[in-house]
Amino acid sequence: MVNSVVFFEITRDGKPLGRISIKLFADKIPKTAENFRALSTGEKGFRYKGSCFHRIIPGFMCQGGDFTRPNGTGDKSIYGEKFDDENLIRKHTGSGILSMANAGPNTNGSQFFICAAKTEWLDGKHVAFGKVKERVNIVEATEHFGYRNSKTSKKITIADCGQF
């Protein structure tokens, strides 16, 4: 299986921050990677485009992927509402690691987070399935618009997304 690369065009209050590219580990985590890739392209009729990062915690992560309700309570995968943890072999080794947000075991949907630091306490609990390949500095810059309580001071949006 080919490791796809997707992109996000990120904006802050409608102003461009830049484009990040994300390599998906489809060779090891194919089902999770395919869900994210398809939600990036919109080929199933729904997508990440226009959704926001609703939870940003400096020194920890930036969470997004709720395109059904922009407040973090919505979740929808290409497989239905939720799907099982595929495997938990990848570690949360540092800034730029892409992982599934969940509400416990086997509750993956569309929500994801990008790590801003090493988060080893998430190993074995969240499926890490990709890594920011280019422009991780944009992810790091978005941290400045978050607070410890996970609220955001600016609207950070995925203005466009797709696959290279």
UniProtKB/Swiss-Prot annotation:
Gene3D superfamilies: Cyclophilin-like. GO terms for biological process: protein folding. Keywords: Cytoplasm, Isomerase, Rotamase. Pfam families: Pro_isomerase. It catalyses: [protein]-peptidylproline (omega=180) = [protein]-peptidylproline (omega=0). GO terms for molecular function: cyclosporin A binding; peptidyl-prolyl cis-trans isomerase activity. The keyword Protein transport does not apply. Its EC number is 5.2.1.8. The keyword ATP-binding does not apply. Residues 7-163 form the PPIase cyclophilin-type domain. GO terms for cellular component: cytoplasm. It is an enzyme of class 5 (isomerase). It is one of six related genes or pseudogenes found in a cluster, thought to result from gene duplication, on chromosome 1. Belongs to the cyclophilin-type PPIase family. PPIase A subfamily. This is Peptidyl-prolyl cis-trans isomerase A-like 4D.
